[in-house]
Amino acid sequence: MSNVQRPTFNSPRSSVLWKLLFFAIVAGYCLYYAPFGVNETDGGFLTGLAWQVLNGKTLYYDIVYVRPPLSVWLRALEIQFLPEQFAVLGERWIFYGKVALYSWLGAAVLAKGERRWQLAVFGFVVSAHCYPPMAWHTVDGILFAVMAAFFTHSKQGLNLLIAGTCLFCALLCKQSFYPLLPIIGVFLFLEKEARWKRIGWFFGGFALSFVLFFNYLRQNNLLDNFLKMTSGAASTAQAFQHGILDYFRITPALALPSILFLLPVAWWFWKGRNPRIALVAWSLWLFALVASFAAITWLRQDHTAPIAQSRVMFWVAVICILPSVLRLKAVGRISPSFLLLGISWCASVSWGYNFPMLFTTPWVLAGMEVTRVLEDASKPIRFPKPYRFLLLLSLLFTFRIAHEFVYRDGRRSEMDVHMGSIFPQLSGIYSDQETADLYLDLKKLATKYGPNFKTLPAFPQANYLTKTTPPFPLDWVVNRETNGDNTLIFKDLQEKKPVIFIQKYFRDKIESDPELEVTRLLFQRDKVVEETPHFWVVTNHDL
């Protein structure tokens, strides 16, 4: 037996340091990353829908929305309560607040003391990565789902009631969270202490929320439309593709070196031999994983998401807990990890961001656990504490490189135009001159032709920025956002006869992309009355 003492990682000074790091990094992201860039697609998606609600429209009646409603309502509340000059910047701060909160809550479920704050720090940095800060239904769903997981650890009936309500709120954000109901049911069943009492309280809260929501739909004659719009958003084949098959899509350039690095690690876990080699190989692989993303981003010179890297780490987490699940060994200990990994998986079932990167806490913990186990087996060469800080610094540096290429905008270093000088709602937001010219073009056209206008196919927050009433039942007019049913759009087009501003950015896609059916019909049949650097203005709709 070695007489090397295991160091105490829960020293008060070190614990305070990680707490300070957590809050400092979150504040730093709000100040350093939130003000830069703006886009005309995802960035205003929920804002546009919320603006429709605030203009007196009703979801599923005169607003087309193929997801459950909660995120739209939450964004409407934000617009109501945030000062106008803080509407978009505040939205981004709230995004970072949500990611920080669910990263900490997930860490609180999985760890204690200093380790909890370490996990929260790494969980936040990796989950936030270079994702564009904005109101988003997936982020809301994760927050409520992790809150449900957090409150299920309580033995008190009220907390379990809250947990059931939180889970229903997660399901009201996005359909991909529906599988959480059986997952969390299994989790509660595996908790032997006061099992049936806890299940009763939890599902009591869930059932109460369910009854209240569907009673609202029934009383407002929205139930049929709600079921029709939300049930056709994705096919079984799409769910299988994004929920299962996509996890095997890992580029060979990353997969093959990973196999070489991880062979010594697998050999130690199987045979218990050469732990020092395994620890060195594992540590080098982690740094190589981070470096590979930095290198790919810099080579592409464009916004890049860590798709393959996140899938590899998800597989690491699955491999870590799967043997215990299959043998029903230490179920009480591994079930929280299983539950949170389920949340990460549900969040990744998506049309666009179909990889487990928005909630990374469970697979970050898996990486920390592998490191801890290998350290314990290699005591003579234990890595010092700065190892964790070096990894944190490498992550922060890597994501700074990634943030240089702002999502669907330009380079951060070239963004020196204050967008608040064009629209007050964009106060505190900076972009480059090209983007500023686009927004100036919109403002001039809205002044000339407004207030009855619509941008196509995107620019979902155009009516919000110009403070005009949206004439269409949705703002991002693509077939996937209508389930291919454009009846309400054509109805509003005939009745309200808005002037249409078609974005030239989509000129190469209008003729061929089946998603742009409405834009293509209008562009082909309507009369172009004016052309600006960024838009075609069309009128005289005859469909």
Regions inferred by a protein language model and the residue ranges of each:
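Perimembrane helix-loop-helix junctions
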Residues: R13, L180-V211, F226, S231-F240, ...
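Extracytoplasmic catalytic/substrate-binding loops of multi-pass membrane glycan-assembly enzymes
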Residues: A34-L49, Y60-L77, Q85-F86, N220-L222, ...
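Short periplasmic/luminal acceptor-recognition loop of GT-C membrane glycosyltransferases, typified by
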Residues: V66, L181, H403-R480, P498-K509, ...
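Transmembrane-helix motifs of polytopic, lipid-linked glycan transferases
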Residues: W93-E114
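Membrane-interface alpha helices of multi-pass inner-membrane proteins
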Residues: A128-H129, N159-Q175, L180-F187, A207-L208, ...
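Short acidic/glycine- and proline-prone juxtamembrane loop motifs at membrane-interface regions
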Residues: Y131-I142
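Specific aromatic-rich, kink-prone transmembrane helix
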Residues: D140-L167, W315-C320
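Transmembrane-embedded, aromatic-rich helix segments that form part
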Residues: Q175-L190, I259-L260, P356-T360
